[in-house]
């Protein structure tokens, strides 16, 4: 009798503030979990919004951790090991130009709320270039059957909710207003590293494994 193979670990390459920084702490508290320490965090109390409603609304980004995806979660192709992934990330990070991000704005992106770079800001070009490089250079390491597709039109975003239809319209409005106020004090962020996250089993919480600094 054969033993079924365990599902492969999936990885995500993303932007994320450095753990311990104010930018990381702010996002982790909003979501209710620190993906670096793998510990829950107390969420914001929003007047008029039940705690369980906010917890439900933030469930999806809480599982993924505080990250802006550059390459969608992927499993390693057969024969590719962790060392090869680390080497590829080092090469990739050293090929990218760091940039300062402007103050991020709360916007609706599809059916979620997220922090985004203003559409007219030049940083979007650098972020789009980095995302394209991630997809191109890591494609050879990825198992096509273990990948999730990202939208063809990339837009940098840090998700702060899951699907808005999980709560009613008045709650959506209260959460939007609270997010605008909460993140208005977010310190300026720099895109100067690639963050590597891992999902150890299907449906498990993602963990932040590493930050690979850009060399320039």
PLM region spans:
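Basic, often amphipathic N-terminal segments
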Residues: 1-109, 125-185, 201-216
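Short histidine-centered catalytic/ligand-binding loop motif
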Residues: 75, 116-123
